[in-house]
From Swiss-Prot:
UniProt keyword annotation of Lipid biosynthesis present: no
Pfam families per the UniProt record, alphabetical: Ribosomal_S13
GO BP of this protein: translation
A GO term for molecular function: rRNA binding
Protein name from the UniProt record: Small ribosomal subunit protein uS13
The entry's keywords: Ribonucleoprotein, Ribosomal protein, RNA-binding, rRNA-binding, tRNA-binding
Keyword field contains Ribosomal protein: yes
InterPro entries registered for this protein in UniProt: Rbsml_uS13_C (IPR027437), Ribosomal_uS13 (IPR001892), Ribosomal_uS13-like_H2TH (IPR010979), Ribosomal_uS13_bac-type (IPR019980), Ribosomal_uS13_CS (IPR018269)
Family annotation (PANTHER family): 30S RIBOSOMAL PROTEIN S13/40S RIBOSOMAL PROTEIN S18, SMALL RIBOSOMAL SUBUNIT PROTEIN US13M
Length: 125
């Protein structure tokens, strides 16, 4: 297994697909990395030479923010919003949707599992 940015990427997959295992590298970024280094689309990780792996590693380290650095930056951005006390920060603090989605119904992913209210019973007529 090749180790890139602290992640063991699978050897039997194509390079464009395998690079996506690194947090912060998606389809377009993986494709642009392969284009810059002139790695063919059909080439698999186990077919890469040591020199090509080193070039990929150097390119990612120099130009991209991935893995721990990216996670830390995202967490710091959210913490900054919460410390400011702005609307988005308050929504993060309360664990509610941040981008204007409705919360009367839905938003279960952000709010957690629905809890029934004890003592509230249906009235029969």
């Amino acid at each position: 297994m090749a180790r890139i940015a602290g992640v063991n990427i699978p050897t039997n997959k194509r390079v464009v697909i395998a690079l996506r295992y690194v947090y912060g590298i998606g389809p377009s970024t993986a494709q642009s990395i392969c284009n810059k280094l002139e790695i063919p689309d059909a080439k698999r990780v186990n077919e890469l030479s040591d020199d090509e792996i080193v070039k990929i590693r150097e390119l990612i380290d120099s130009e991209l923010r991935v893995e721990g650095d990216l996670r830390r930056e995202t967490a710091m951005n959210i913490k900054r919003l919460m410390d400011l006390g702005c609307y988005r920060g308050l929504r993060h603090r309360r664990g509610l949707p941040v981008r204007g989605q409705r919360t009367h119904t839905n938003a279960r992913t952000r709010k957690g599992k629905a809890v029934a209210i004890a003592g509230k019973k249906k009235v029969t007529r």
